[in-house]
Amino acid sequence: MFEKLLVPVDLSPQSQMMATAAARMASYGVREVVLYSALEHHSKRDPLLKAIDDRLGESGLKHRVVTEVRKDPASAILKAAEAQGSTMIAMAASGKGRVREFFVGSTSLAVIRRSKLPVLLDKFPMEADSDPVGFVEHSPGLLDSVLVTLDLSKATKHMMPYVQQLVDAGARRVTLLHVVQSSRYSITDERRFQEVNRKLEEHRSKLETGDCQVDTYVRFGTSTYNILESAREAEATLIMLGTTGKSYLRGATLGST
């Protein structure tokens, strides 16, 4: 999953941090990073792009820069990922370049919805803009604590191989989470909670965990609130969500916290 990353950059502090994070991921199996810029005014001679390229060079990772002129950033990113043979797209959730916005919510969402590859979406705090490199270098490892949200539908079986890949890549701790929906079940529905616990344990038992600590966790209520609360409690460094379409799993979205 991590072997060949496509990292779209708009040269904002956010995309600089994403590229720096990619440079730290060699231990997770990253072998090559392709820096991709689709902004019209950029070229390989841009000093900021060169600085990011140099940082990747210091990491020892194989890397290169691809620049293109494109009007639709989401389509450009997806086409570039396919053309470069990427195994994952790693991008900042939002950012503002020196000329115009590139990564906005709609772009990130479009990439997630349409990508057949896993997407690593990283959102960095605004206060990190003053020292983007220092912020990333002092942050915990991406796979230190992974929260995996499972809806326990038929699509879950397609998601578990991605979880195994995270474990194999060096995840220290993985928490398998299911939220029992308050709109469909009662908190006193013992039968439902027993069924959920059984299914989570089945998925946990099939993982080859090695040195990784794998826990299961069940919450009750609405998905968004409980995922965020669980991430806070587990001190999650990464949240893994399945993305679905027409009842089958198309890929996985990884969101760094």
List the predicted regions and their residue ranges:
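Intrinsically disordered or low-complexity boundary/linker segments at protein termini
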Residues: 1-17, 24, 88, 110-159, ...
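A structural alpha-helix within SAM-dependent methyltransferase catalytic domains
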Residues: 19, 23, 27, 78, ...
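Acidic, proline/glycine-rich short linear motifs
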Residues: 20-62, 67, 79-82, 135-137, ...
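Structural beta-alpha unit
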Residues: 40-41, 54, 58-89, 94-97, ...
